[in-house]
Amino acid sequence: MKKFKYSFILVFILLFNIKDLTYAQGDIGVGNLRNFYTKHDYIDLKGVTDKNLPIANQLEFSTGTNDLISESNNWDEISKFKGKKLDIFGIDYNGPCKSKYMYGGATLSGQYLNSARKIPINLWVNGKHKTISTDKIATNKKLVTAQEIDVKLRRYLQEEYNIYGHNNTGKGKEYGYKSKFYSGFNNGKVLFHLNNEKSFSYVLFYTGDGLPVSFLKIYEDNKIIESEKFHLDVEISYVDSN
């Protein structure tokens, strides 16, 4: 009887620890998503030259104290960028040997509009619609990565609606703090509605395995779009999972 009792206690402890580990990993994802998208300084480089190294899926640049390596699974696109002057925009994370890594974020340098275009946005907040046009989500590039627009959008949503919690603007308090992000939201997506191509979307609250190397991988294809031929449809809401 004692043996059975001790076995039961051991199983209970193991299950409890697994639950705690999962919860902790979830917390890591929440914190990392908030920090990397809204507090981390993003990469914004103009006219930097790729080192033209023989690694098919990587671009590499010198940025002073660190090398910056951009990885992509779009080998055809990357091959066109080898040795060229590029503009780089995106979120980096720490890699081995003091290098900074990121996914995609590359466009050819020198292809600019006469003036920056504010990206038109349809925004639904808990089902209520409004339109947005702001300098904070704009670009002067003729061809821009989806990553650049998505990063700027998320930072704007954090500042105005506190989607990831703990913003420093004081805005968004009216939506409460009921989600695990300590905000009023846990569900949402951004749809890139292209004029002449198939639309695509990103989930705004996707945390992957909790680490940036995982949740930033959505930009691995270095998706590039014509900046004058799309708008955004954005939805944010709260979904009770109970």
Named regions from a protein language model:
Residues F205-N242:
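Proteolytic cleavage junctions
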